[in-house]
Amino acid sequence: MAGKWHLGHHAPFLPPRHGFDESFGIPYSNDMWPHHPEAKPGTYPPLPLIEDGRITDAEVTPAEQEQLTTRLTERAVRFIERHKERPFFFYLAHPQPHVPLFVSEKFKGKSGRGLYADVMMELDWSVGQVLGALERHGLTRDTLVIFTSDNGPWLSYGDHAGSARPHREGKGTAWEGGTRVACLMRWPGRLPAGATSDQYVMTIDLLPTLAGLIGAPAPTRKIDGRDVWPILAGQPGATTPHEGYGNWYAQNELQAVVSGNGEWKLVLPHRYRTLGGRPGGTGGIPAKYETVTLEKPALYRLSTDRAETTDVAAQHPEVVARLQAFAEKCRAELGDSLTKRQGSGVREPGRIEGAPTKKKAKSG
């Protein structure tokens, strides 16, 4: 893999310990480093560059950030060239366009529409380089390419962020603007070109789907994803294997549940951040969010109202009851800090063996 890992920066949590033979990139995101415009002195340690579990550059500088998209792309292309004779899996997780933004000289100012657009042009170039490498080595028809994202835009950054329109809100919320992202797949001969699907799937479904395609045994531990290949392949009559999906955020808050087919979404009472219609910031400095409270559950029919403008809970009490029951199943297994539920299936967080633990202060 190459790019942003963001699943822990100590050795037990790095890619070599989690199935990757090769890895190169940064352990967390761009805003978690001393060079962020709003970072206070001492808030973050230096951002290192790590290769195969070893630090090769203790402090990535802004100048090096400008070259990172190019370097990650080159890694992906070289990996394809070296492994063209055997099956492979490569995960390319570009840090951009996460703020703060950086772009190489070859794309700086090229879009004519600002830094964010320049960054997107460079990422478009990167995708083209990877697809070109597959084409050169005759691998196009043998390779499933998946292009997707982890969340919606960070709206407070304004001209250094994207747009979630027509969806509501953005990153850091359970509204569609925060959770619904693009997913494009290419596999000539297996996936029809130009086809679209309105079926609802989640990133958690990728692992079991890919495992099923290559005939790999299912993981022995319990996972929440399901094999959704029949849906992706457009097989007639294919339906979701999920009863529904849960959207947790913050300190394990179950903020919304969605029916398995994506028809209905019940947003549960919680506090969330919003710009309240105000514009985002400029030049990499974010605008301030305000916090509002959703006092009662709100139901939206996503098939006709993806913008979540009209609460139809009063018109469909039976749907509300069904999704509330599903939410209770979610809480029973994975907990919910909003309702102070622990959850029978909650695992302990990863810890470093021998690391000191925080002691609670004595009262009195």
What is the meaning of each model-derived region?
Residues 18, 70-74, 121-128, 201-208, ...:
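A structural signal for well-ordered alpha-helical segments within the folded catalytic domains
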Residues 7-85, 94-103, 271-273, 289, ...:
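Formylglycine-dependent
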Residues 1-13, 27-29, 91-100, 147-155, ...:
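Short, solvent-exposed turn/loop segments enriched in Gly/Ser/Thr/Pro and often Arg
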Residues 10-19, 99-103, 109-119, 132-190, ...:
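Histidine-centered active-site microenvironments of extracellular/periplasmic hydrolases
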Residues 19-21, 84-90, 139-145, 180, ...:
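Loop/turn elements at helix/coil->beta-strand transitions in domains of secreted/extracellular proteins
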Residues 76, 206, 271-272, 280-298, ...:
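Long, internal low-complexity/basic segments
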Residues 76, 87-93, 120, 127, ...:
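Beta-strand elements within well-structured catalytic alpha/beta cores of enzymes
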Residues 21-32, 40, 153-165, 169-176, ...:
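C-terminal cap/loop subdomain of S1 sulfatases and analogous C-terminal strand-loop tails that border
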